[in-house]
């Protein structure tokens, strides 16, 4: 009898441990599958505001606070725009002073917590940039997809699509440049975004199903006069662009791809986000399996460039070694495998999805050179 009881207790313990591991894997996978738009990814540190004065802001000294370039600074109920580090401004050893360009809304005071975001602009193109725009609804398979349309004289449209941790406001970073060069721009909100249809299962599929909303945007553009389209995607938006270029029924109208911090291995990205939530390394494979079970995502035999061997249109990739969410090495592999089609522009000291922010002028010059033959 004692043996039977001991065996039953051991079995119960094993079952309990297994259930706990499954639950832990499921929770860890939420870091990617339930990443809310417009909120910081777990890889992005919170910074403390130490004070503001005369066009300057003092932040906790951190590698993030030392990044070069121009960023949004978001807190709970506030948004500001910060410029480069002011190395000559007086500061203590544990702080950093950056240029404070503007406070878009809310207030920033000592003790506030905030994070850097690639979203420099908030609102809409008319309010943030002074560009005439129209709010349009794009018919999608799950319902109407809200988008901003900024008109331009050319018949090649740029369709911009954001990725993890951001919103369609991210497209405004390059919208002024595109408008100066007379490109019509369509900035898309897709399933799971504010105002867009809900995802059927409530989960982010990291571009693997969301690309169909981008396909709907391509169809809308062609119906409304676009002869060709260039897809400009950030993060999982870049994944969507690659999928649409390969599978859209109108892929012959896609003349170029701009891929910023592309997620080329969803498993690697999921592991990175789960690890940033302090998931123990031993549980990371469970997070991947949980994600597969919840979403039906395929095994990551796509970690390298092989799925894109059939790429038939030119692509410009903006990426760099400081991206801890979507490793740069996969972009390097893609560029090395397809030098005939893929140009890699390497950006240093920039986090995921923020290649423009690190050096807007250089980014836009590379973009101009790429787009010129496609005009």
Question: What does each model-found stretch correspond to?
Answer:
Residues 310-312, 317-319, 323:
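Short beta-strand/loop motif that positions the catalytic acidic residue
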Residues 178-198:
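Conserved alpha/beta-hydrolase
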Residues 203-224, 230:
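Alpha/beta-hydrolase active-site loop
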Residues 1-130:
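N-terminal targeting or regulatory segments adjacent to alpha/beta-hydrolase or S9 domains
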Residues 350-364:
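Catalytic histidine-centered segment of alpha/beta-hydrolase-like enzymes
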Residues 246-300:
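Hydrolase active-site cap/lid region
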Residues 155-163:
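Short beta-strand element of the alpha/beta-hydrolase
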Residues 324-330:
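Conserved alpha/beta-hydrolase "acid-adjacent" motif
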């Amino acid at each position: 009898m004692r043996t039977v009881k001991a065996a039953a207790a051991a079995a119960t313990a094993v079952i309990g441990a297994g259930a706990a591991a499954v639950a832990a894997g499921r929770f860890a996978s939420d870091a990617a599958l339930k990443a809310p738009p417009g909120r910081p990814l777990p890889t992005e540190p919170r910074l403390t505001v130490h004070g503001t004065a005369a066009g300057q802001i003092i932040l906790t000294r951190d590698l993030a606070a030392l990044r070069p370039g121009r960023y949004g600074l978001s807190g709970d109920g506030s948004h500001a725009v910060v410029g480069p580090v002011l190395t000559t401004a007086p500061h203590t050893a544990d702080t950093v002073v950056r240029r404070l360009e503007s406070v878009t809304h809310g207030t920033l005071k000592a003790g506030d917590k905030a994070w850097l975001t690639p979203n420099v602009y908030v609102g809409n193109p008319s309010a943030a940039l002074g560009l005439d725009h129209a709010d349009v609804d794009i018919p999608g398979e799950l319902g109407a997809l809200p988008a901003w349309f900024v008109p331009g004289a050319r018949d090649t449209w740029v369709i911009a699509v954001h990725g993890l941790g951001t919103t369609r406001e991210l497209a405004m970073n390059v919208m002024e440049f595109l408008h100066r060069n007379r490109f019509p721009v369509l900035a898309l909100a897709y399933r799971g975004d504010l105002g867009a249809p809900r995802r059927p299962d409530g989960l982010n599929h990291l571009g693997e199903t969301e690309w169909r909303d981008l396909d709907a945007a391509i169809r809308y553009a062609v119906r409304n006069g676009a002869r060709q389209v260039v897809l400009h995607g950030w993060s999982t938006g870049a994944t969507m662009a690659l999928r649409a270029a390969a599978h859209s029924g109108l892929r012959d109208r896609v003349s170029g791809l701009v891929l910023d911090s592309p997620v080329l291995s969803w498993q690697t990205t999921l592991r990175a986000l789960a690890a940033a939530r302090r998931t123990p390394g031993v549980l990371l494979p469970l997070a991947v399996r949980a994600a597969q079970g919840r979403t039906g995502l395929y095994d990551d035999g796509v970690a390298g460039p092989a799925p894109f061997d059939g790429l038939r249109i030119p692509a410009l990739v903006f990426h760099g070694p400081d991206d801890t969410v979507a490793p740069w090495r996969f972009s390097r592999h893609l560029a090395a495998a397809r030098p005939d089609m893929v140009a890699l522009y390497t950006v240093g000291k920039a986090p995921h999805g923020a290649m423009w922010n690190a050096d807007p002028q250089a980014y836009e010059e590379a973009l101009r050179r790429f787009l010129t033959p496609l005009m």
